[in-house]
Amino acid sequence: MEYKKLLQALQIDINQKGCHSGGEWHGEGKKIASYSPVDGSLLGTVQGATIEDYERLLDKAEDAFESFRIIPAPKRGELVRQLGNKLREKKFQLGQLVSLEMGKSLQEGLGEVQEMIDICDFAVGLSRQLHGVTMTSERPSHRLYEQYHPLGVVGVISAFNFPVAVWSWNVALAWICGNVCIWKPSEKTPLCGIACQQIISEVLKENKISEGVSCLLNGDSEVGKWLADDQRIALVSATGSTRMGKDVAKRVGARLGKSLLELGGNNAIIITPNADLDTALMAAVFGAVGTCGQRCTSTRRLIVHKDIFETFKDVLKKAYAQLRIGNPLDEKNHMGPLIDEDAVTMYNKARKQVDSQGGSWLVPGGVLDKGSYGSNCYVKPAIAIIDHDAPIVHQETFAPILYLIQYEGSVEEAIAIQNEVKQGLSSSIMSLNMRETETFLSHWGSDCGIANVNIGTSGAEIGGAFGGEKETGGGRESGSDAWKAYMRRQTNTLNFSKELPLAQGIVFDYKFFNN
């Protein structure tokens, strides 16, 4: 594949300025080198933001908000529709770039762009349904209702594992709701951010929309802190590790600002004796090795009943033996590389912790040779048999390591094991028994934001709200009523009588005012 032609098709320079609000590209900060984990090649460099670049973008965004918020929501929906069409035109090239810069398989890269298209379609319909609620007033000749208004400037901080889709979840809903956006992409995938900004800028220019409605701000974690600390940023939507999310929450909370956090997951599949084992196997393998185990919703734990433990262990081992690892742009391969060598170091550290904490290896894993694979970022997926209370099991291991855990009793025991970790993003049960599945979905069942039956933990549709509980952050993005996080809520009471009755039946004698 000729990388330069791909970058040219997406309007990316090899030496690229990293800040943009719709006019000229700028950026005088630190240079960020983008290396492909596929073969270790240098794809390009992006010059990040200084504080002066940041202020320049923020000024543009604040000015743009004043005019953008008064555009009717269905008209803003038309802009999102056009963005979706641009993404359809660029789907293959953008999907290739995602695979090239991040390392996920081409099928997953294309799927990520399709997710962007889907959220645009969803948001277009939503633009005519930003409805409030009308309530019955206790006072005669009064009307009581709620409505929603735009927030202002929304700051988006995204992670490397979904370098384009998470941005689209935010910008599509934020636009529909009348907000403007400043996006700080991961410094590990800056070129994906450049490509998206070029695409969205075409839509804005063609519609003569003010500069500043969509801004790009490349840089390191220091740049993210600027967004989190700035009281002019009405909402900070941050996706990443729990450690990062705690820092963002602390900074935004210190100014009593709004934050939307989608953080780590330690996702489990419960497999009961009543499971369809073929379905369970497919869900477990894709969940564990898809995106090389670097999805927020990747399957980290399999909680399997003792009666089927040995049988499932055998078929799982056979399935892993058939996985093809290699260049993610080759559609024959199931799994590509980890994002970088730091991720490989964390993978090796986790394997050592498994050894020291009494685990054994069903599939031992290991780092693959650079000479055969093109970079130092390729690893083997691993499966460890380990106790549910081992410390490593309670951490989010952002790598293709699957922890195989046995339970002996009822489904309630399995649910308790699932819920004992600090994270609460995604969960799943494999069972054809209605009592087991309904228990799992009940208020005493899974404590996660996502609870699935007979599908895996990974691969959420955009129609549902996406997010989790506990150390996952509590925020919700994407579908359902997640749009409400991007608006300020207002309660209105209208009096169309000639009197001024007070709520709760309070009597206030004011007749003497007229004397």
Regions found by a protein language model. Give the residues of each.
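Hydrophobic face of amphipathic alpha-helices that form TPR/SEL1-like repeat modules
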Residues: 1-39
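ALDH superfamily catalytic-core signature
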Residues: 199-202, 243-388, 412, 416, ...
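Conserved C-terminal structural/oligomerization subdomain of aldehyde/semialdehyde dehydrogenase
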Residues: 41-44, 209, 233, 270, ...
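Generic secondary-structure signature for well-ordered alpha-helical cores
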Residues: 63-67, 85-92, 103, 125-132, ...
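Glycine-rich loop-to-alpha-helix module at the N-terminal edge of alpha/beta enzyme cores
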Residues: 41-130, 141
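Residue-level signal for inorganic ion chemistry
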Residues: 40, 76, 98, 120, ...
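Rossmann-like NAD(P) dinucleotide-binding subdomain of oxidoreductase/dehydrogenase enzymes
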Residues: 132-279
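Short, well-ordered beta-strand elements within core beta-sheets of diverse protein domains
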Residues: 42-49, 64-70, 156, 269-272, ...
